[in-house]
């Protein structure tokens, strides 16, 4: 990650900018909150990069909070840390849809990190990225989630095996 830090601003975005945050971190807290996500977060903050990281545990079945949607829209970059449990979280999937929507409108630049997962599993929605587990309760959202996962898997990113 250190080699990519030059892609980010060296200091926080000015108050006249439309961005409140330099970077928005999207991650599954279950697998990465205290490991990869914290490492990335503190490395960015140490470089003076204003980074949004949601610190709350998310309740199952709750919809994505307006605060998070606003933080995505107010960020210049998004780092999406795709890990083993990412697709188990409907919250993460909803967040990803919003990030990809902003990316396709050229409002945000997305950097995926495939953390202990194969990018082709994300692209094809197989293994832990299969959305079959969600089809019964979230049928209306599954196709949108699949499209977002395929899109993020096609972006240039980092494949990290720990």
Segments from the language model and where they lie:
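Cross-kingdom TIR/SEFIR domain
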Residues: 42-46, 51, 57, 64-162
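Conserved N-terminal substructure of TIR/SEFIR domains
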Residues: 1-77, 108
């Amino acid at each position: 990650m250190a080699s990519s830090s030059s892609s980010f601003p060296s200091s926080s975005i000015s108050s006249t900018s439309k961005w409140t945050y330099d970077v928005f971190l999207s991650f599954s807290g279950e697998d990465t909150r205290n490991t990869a996500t914290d490492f990335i977060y503190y490395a960015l903050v140490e470089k003076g990069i204003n980074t949004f990281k949601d610190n709350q545990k998310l309740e199952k079945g709750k919809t994505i909070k307006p605060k998070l949607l606003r933080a995505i829209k107010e960020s210049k970059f998004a780092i999406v840390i795709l890990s083993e449990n990412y697709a188990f979280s409907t919250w993460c999937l909803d967040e990803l849809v919003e990030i990809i929507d902003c990316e396709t409108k050229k409002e945000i630049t997305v950097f995926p990190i495939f953390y202990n997962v194969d990018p082709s599993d994300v692209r094809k929605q197989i293994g832990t990225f299969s959305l079959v587990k969600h089809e019964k309760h979230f049928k209306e959202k599954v196709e949108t989630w699949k499209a977002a996962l395929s899109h993020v898997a096609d972006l240039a990113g980092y494949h990290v095996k720990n």
